[in-house]
Amino acid sequence: NAVRALKEKGYAPIIYHELEARQLPPEFIYLALQESNYDERTIGPPTRYGRAKGMWQFIAATGSQYGLKIGPLKDTEQYDPVDERHHPLKSTIAAAKYLKYIYKTDAQASGLLVMASYNWGEGNVINRIRSMPLNPEDRNFWKLIASYEIPQETYDYVLYIFSAAVIGQNPKLFGFNFDNPLQGLDDTG
């Protein structure tokens, strides 16, 4: 179970701390669940942008932009211990920086738009947001999907993370046998 591995590997406090340090929602911890099941050795399929690698599934260009050293096996299907996209702490710091950047764009009105931007690319989402009414109430994920066609992958991505965040609040209520992975990580316990 990925959530159990999150706790056992000690990643929950690392991710929580980096999100909290940047005043980001702690529920963004579930992005790494959707990206890789919290597996730092994950390697994505080849794309026109290269291969995404690591727990946060950075392509080389984005990883480098956010301070990660990219290894010589960047576009191969091989794990590369030199590639910091595979490093749990360093890639989490980079992911938190990237999410903070997205949060400062036009996507800031909605955490769901930030998630869509992380998956589909902030340019794709922001270009559509900018053509929407200026009223913040009209600039949200639900209006985006009602007004524009977005990739099914992005739609599913956002809803899976949203669902994981809801379930994560009280997993036993939904029939899962694990505790809230965020429980006890904040000062209120």
Over which residues does each language-model region extend?
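Extracytoplasmic and endomembrane cell-envelope/extracellular-matrix remodeling and assembly machinery
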Residues: 1-11, 21-22, 65, 71-93, ...
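Active-site acidic/histidine clusters and adjacent loop/turn architecture
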Residues: 15
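Extracellular/periplasmic catalytic domains that process cell-envelope and extracellular macromolecules
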Residues: 23-25, 48-51, 152
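Short, functionally critical alpha-helical segments immediately adjacent to catalytic or ligand/cofactor-binding
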Residues: 24-41, 114-119, 162
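Solvent-exposed coil/turn segments that connect beta secondary-structure elements
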Residues: 34-37, 61-63, 166
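Short amphipathic alpha-helical segments at helix boundaries and their inter-helical linkers
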Residues: 36-54, 129-130
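Short, surface-exposed glycine/acidic/tryptophan-bearing loops
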Residues: 45-69
